Amino acid sequence: DIVVNNAGILRDKTFGNVTLDNFRAVLDVHLMGSVQVTKAAWEIMVQNGWGRVVFTSSGSGIFGNFGQSNYATAKMALIGLMNVLALEGERKGIKVNTLAPGALTRMTERLHDPNRRGRPDQVSPAVLYLCSEQAPQGVILQAADGRFSTIRIHPGKPIDLGPVFICKECPASVPQL
């Protein structure tokens, strides 16, 4: 079984102007819709010992985009969900990944960016790969503007703050990170 979670809506407003109802509506469609659909298929995948789950995030969600606090929150929450389900699904034959597409669609055409040149048919091969036998586990695959790349979230190189760390040292330490 394969689940591709791709439902979405936009309710763009700056954080100061977005209503809680609009914020919740975006979370309900993007996050809770994906949770409900995936939950419905999960036990079947476990029983079959095989499955693929693809969540749809977004570069706007991952890196931020003005006026999209609700959208970014929902899209990053899906990445957190992917991270956990990839761990839980690993021993059960279930591969869980996230697609971060960048293409002009009906939903995004009003936000036209002259630098954006991607089309949905350039994203489709990424979806097919994430649903294939060769699918990776726990990967964020960006398919944007005719190019593919992975997006990784990882800690930077740590610095040793010594045995006693005093908060007033923070401003001097942060640039070293």
Which ranges hold each PLM region?
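Residue(s) in the substrate-gating loop at a strand-loop-helix junction
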Residues: 58
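Active-site loop-to-helix junction immediately N-terminal to the catalytic Tyr of the SDR YXXXK motif
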Residues: 18, 64-72, 84, 112
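A short helix-coil junction within the Rossmann-fold of NAD(P)-dependent oxidoreductases
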Residues: 13, 40-49
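Active-site-adjacent segment of SDR/Rossmann-fold oxidoreductases
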Residues: 63, 79, 84-94, 133-135
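Active-site helix of classical SDR
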Residues: 38, 74
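Substrate-binding pocket helix/loop in short-chain dehydrogenase/reductase
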Residues: 14-15, 22-24
